[in-house]
Curated annotation (Swiss-Prot):
Its EC number is 2.3.2.29. This is Aspartate/glutamate leucyltransferase. Keywords: Acyltransferase, Cytoplasm, Transferase. One of its GO terms (biological process) is ubiquitin-dependent protein catabolic process via the N-end rule pathway. It comes from Xylella fastidiosa (strain Temecula1 / ATCC 700964).
Length: 254
């Protein structure tokens, strides 16, 4: 992985101990983590997205596994994006829903949806016991970039409609980053995860941000392969961003 760190030559990266892979049950993983005590993290966070890093709470990390390079950083070139037929159907199916951007501040309604989502969609995944403290630690960043994009049923008699999804999104001066999305598990047929990304792309276009970072694409993984459907997609090969291809190798060069 190449990092253009000339303005930050003293950046410190730490490699974590091995831990069970969150994607493949028979593999072990490790990550590179930027020094969480570095006071510059908030300022350089937008640039770290272009280096393939992700945010989890106040930690900036990227996978760095000795014998596996399956996690490939991807981003959508929003100005070149064209929705496919399935995505157009998703937009039409959900045309009556209401989307709004709110501050990244937890409320009881959001927390209830988050806990329901984890309990039904990720049981025994290590997160299904999350409460208010874990919600804040995981989703709300300390640097002021975070926003919550809420997707709701239409209002009735002035009362907001049911909260169906929350897309935690970081808005930087260079791009948007899709941090985490959770939604009503009983409304999965609506394709709310896809809808959230489509609205994030529109949001980036509206804010004149050229990219939406989607985290890591994992080829043929049932939870992560969907990201390739949002074209024009770009991948980070460890040195530079390239047009998406399922055949590009990745590296972990420092």
């Amino acid at each position: 992985m190449a990092i253009d760190s000339k303005p930050h030559d003293d950046l410190q990266l730490f490699k974590t101990n091995l831990h069970p892979c969150g994607y493949w049950p028979d593999r072990w993983a490790s990550d590179l983590v930027m020094d969480p005590n570095d006071p510059r993290l908030g300022a350089i966070y937008p640039q770290t997205l272009a280096w393939g890093f992700r945010r989890s709470g106040n930690l900036l990390y990227r996978p760095h596994c000795e014998h596996c390079n399956a996690c490939v950083p991807v981003r959508v070139n929003v100005n070149a994006f064209v929705p496919n037929r399935s995505q157009r159907r998703c937009l039409a199916r959900n045309a009556t829903l209401v989307t709004r951007i709110v501050p990244a501040e937890r409320n009881a309604e959001q927390l209830s949806l988050y806990r329901r989502y984890l309990h039904q969609r990720h049981p025994d995944g290590g997160m299904d016991g999350h409460g208010a403290i874990e919600f804040d630690q995981f989703l709300i960043g300390p640097w002021g970039y975070g926003r919550f994009m809420e997707i709701r049923e239409p209002a009735t008699n002035g009362t907001p409609g049911q909260l169906l999804a929350v897309a935690v999104t970081d808005l930087t001066h260079q791009a948007l980053s899709a941090v985490y999305t959770f939604y009503e598990p009983n409304a999965a047929a609506r394709g709310l995860g896809t809808l959230a990304i489509l609205h994030q792309i529109h949001w980036a276009q509206r804010e004149q941000r050229p990219y939406l970072y989607l985290g890591y694409w994992i080829k043929d993984h049932f939870k992560m392969d969907y990201k390739r459907r949002f074209q024009k997609l770009e991948i980070y090969d460890g040195y530079r961003w390239r047009p998406f291809s399922t055949t590009y190798p990745t590296t972990h060069t420092l």
